[in-house]
């Protein structure tokens, strides 16, 4: 028979009483009234913030967007197949945040910061709120450093500076994404962290972009945020803010960052879908009234910080798709008014064989001129004007039979300048190569070269400089100026390449 030991029993009871935890966890729980089309109506969530994360029974997350008298309208970030009417919903007390940090580089994540590239978890403990206030006036300084895209026509005529917002706008299939990806590739070795946000794109297209970046060695300093076409509208809406939050982390550490939003038209459409399903009143083109604020609060986060704040920068290249070149539609005009300039891509120029198909006449950079390097500013001053005049003259000359010699000469030079600015995809040029090519065209040194051989001449000129005049390239890249000595060298090189080429033609 087992002997009972009262002292042992009493000590156990005392221990239980001592360890008894009286704390009570209170959670704010509601009930799903209605669900469908990625929207849930919830009753009973009294203490909930606008934009707060909600947790459904099956683990799906949602965001509270509509706070009404008797219910809360929430958007679902997932398929939510397990959520039914009558299911419980819990408020988390948190606003959406994403992981940030060095470990994110080279990875592909979804808008919640979860890896989707099959390489395992991301080892980072730092997080940042998706929605952050943009830095104020005192925290900023004016744009003064160049963000070289590697595309001659942009760096010479529509220069982009670090901290600028430059819109890339054009019809579908005119090379908008190609310009953005070229810019990322050109940042190799520049200590710039790049974030590519793909919104509503085909998964195959995103996989293709990731593969190109990997081949070119650009994925090591790039983070890809992808919300595919098959994802919930809420995720497509959140993706740009996630990209901005990831880049902001590096910006506040004093680094230069570049963010591509490809494209904000799809984000606006996702936001319109959510808003209409939430029964918000529609405005122009059925977009909600605050779609301007949706884009402005995103793009205002791009900045060049003051030296007191570490001097970091976030350069934003938002992309907008137009319908049949209509830049006066609602979303294009909104984003044009928010940004510091736009690069307009023309379908007609693209189809005529001009790549990149930049329409120089209506493309502009409002602040990038201050950031342009002296070398290219010195020689490219007249380039934009000459090309704009060439476009007008070319249109006029179709109706005129006899043109005077000066007009004829201007047309011939315009044709050569346009040929010089043609550039293959994924092959950005460094500053020295751009200076050499633009100098040859603007100074009229290739007026004798047949138009059809101009592209070949530009390639041979760049090759000659690399092989025989490496010191010229080094000097330009280091000093970023074209002094008299370098100019004389360049003239000699152009003369030599031209004579050897004309001899073989």
Curated annotation (Swiss-Prot):
Alphabetized, the UniProt keywords read: ATP synthesis, ATP-binding, CF(1), Hydrogen ion transport, Ion transport, Membrane, Nucleotide-binding, Thylakoid, Translocase, Transport
Q: Where does ATP bind?
A: 170-177
Q: Which GO terms describe its cellular component?
A: plasma membrane-derived thylakoid membrane; proton-transporting ATP synthase complex
EC identifiers of the protein: 7.1.2.2
Q: Where in the cell is it found?
A: Cellular thylakoid membrane
- Reaction equations catalysed: ATP + H2O + 4 H(+)(in) = ADP + phosphate + 5 H(+)(out)
PROSITE patterns, sorted? ATPASE_ALPHA_BETA (PS00152)
What membrane topology was assigned to this protein in its record? Peripheral membrane protein
Report the Pfam families cross-referenced here. ATP-synt_ab, ATP-synt_ab_C, ATP-synt_ab_N
A molecular function GO annotation: ADP binding
Q: What InterPro entries does the record tag this protein with?
A: ATP_synth_asu-like_sf, ATP_synth_asu_C, ATP_synth_asu_C_sf, ATP_synth_F1_a_nt-bd_dom, ATP_synth_F1_asu, ATPase_a/bsu_AS, ATPase_F1/V1/A1_a/bsu_N, ATPase_F1/V1/A1_a/bsu_N_sf
Q: Where is this site: Required for activity?
A: 363
Q: Which NCBIfam families match?
A: atpA, PRK13343.1
- Family assignment? Belongs to the ATPase alpha/beta chains family.
Q: How does it assemble?
A: F-type ATPases have 2 components, CF(1) - the catalytic core - and CF(0) - the membrane proton channel. CF(1) has five subunits: alpha(3), beta(3), gamma(1), delta(1), epsilon(1). CF(0) has four main subunits: a(1), b(1), b'(1) and c(9-12).
Task of the protein: Produces ATP from ADP in the presence of a proton gradient across the membrane. The alpha chain is a regulatory subunit.
Please state what the protein is called: ATP synthase subunit alpha
Q: Which organism is it from?
A: Prochlorococcus marinus (strain MIT 9312)
